Amino acid sequence: MTELGLGGVYLSPKQIGDPEALVHRAFDLGINFFDTAPLYAGGESQRIIGEALADKPCILATKCGRWSWEKGPYRDLEAYKKQLETSLDILKRDCVDVFFIHEADWAVYWEDMDIPRSRCEVELWDVFDYASSPVTQFLNWAQEQGMIKHIGISGNNSHLLTKVINEYPLRIDALLVAFQYSLIWRNAKETLIPTAKKKDIGVILGSPLQQGKLAVPHPEWLEEPPDWMNADTQQRFRALYEIHRETGISLAELSVRYLLANPDFTSLVVGSTNVAHLEENVQHALAGPLPEEIHNKIDELGKVFPGLWGKDF
């Protein structure tokens, strides 16, 4: 698996003029890991990746779940089977290399009850019978059928993903975590990454730019911060912008080079909306680690947010 992967969230003709060309270019640049999901781009992401990579040797990851906020198909074994069979057909594959539970930190996978949106997340004190849940039965079946190679979980909450990893009965091979480790937010370093390392789980990092919040400087935020930014976070952004100003290195390059220097990560999944951005990300990766002084300054910016969500935005 290459240290840089292409995320499929934005892969649709509505957001990218020629999304298949973008995927082809990623492959030509040496990227061999592609992450998608039935949810992404209303299903277009899987179709585009399937068309672009039909005859290419690469590592494909997709996901199950994420139908709605109610229990519905989450408690239906046949719904999972149908979803996987549809994904394989669209991806033009007989087998998925890495198959994630999409947002495994949602209780709706593990509880046989209707769960309102305010209660969608697992709680640290919850007790679940993971083994009897339909998704676990489905994953067992899918592996036995040779339809998936590696089981993974994904999510956005470090504390709750740690709980699932510690309690889940099946072998977890991969963890895809988003929003929990970046230039500023480092919630995953507290318990999640150490737990994954202890259990020999490969850690794949998603949304390294916090869905655009760390993509480019926003000097106006230093004058009038957005609602999600508290005073402490504002000061960290101020310090980050100063590093950017002093070094002349873009925030995107700082992010890619800083994160790839961490040996705990198997791959960094980045989304691109055009070929130029994709090529820039690859060049950033090829540039190698940041100079030690710059790396250490960014290290000092790291923030572990104490709340269960692990973030303040």
Task: Write out the residue ranges for each language-model feature.
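Active-site gating/metal-coordination segments in enzymes
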Residues: 64, 74-101, 106
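N-terminal small/glycine-rich loop or linker at the start of catalytic domains
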Residues: 1-14, 61-71, 100-103, 107-108, ...
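Beta/alpha (TIM)-barrel catalytic core signal, keyed to glycine-rich beta->alpha loops juxtaposed to Asp/Glu
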Residues: 104-312
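Short, acidic/polar
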Residues: 14-26, 75-90, 157-165
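Acidic-and-aromatic substrate-binding clefts and catalytic sites of carbohydrate-active enzymes
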Residues: 12-17, 37-47, 67-70, 106-107, ...
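Acidic (Asp/Glu)-rich catalytic clusters
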Residues: 28, 50-59, 89-92, 165-169, ...
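A short, structured active-site edge motif that brings together acidic residues
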Residues: 56-69, 177-181
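N-terminal binding-site loop/beta-alpha segment at the start of enzyme catalytic domains
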Residues: 1-62
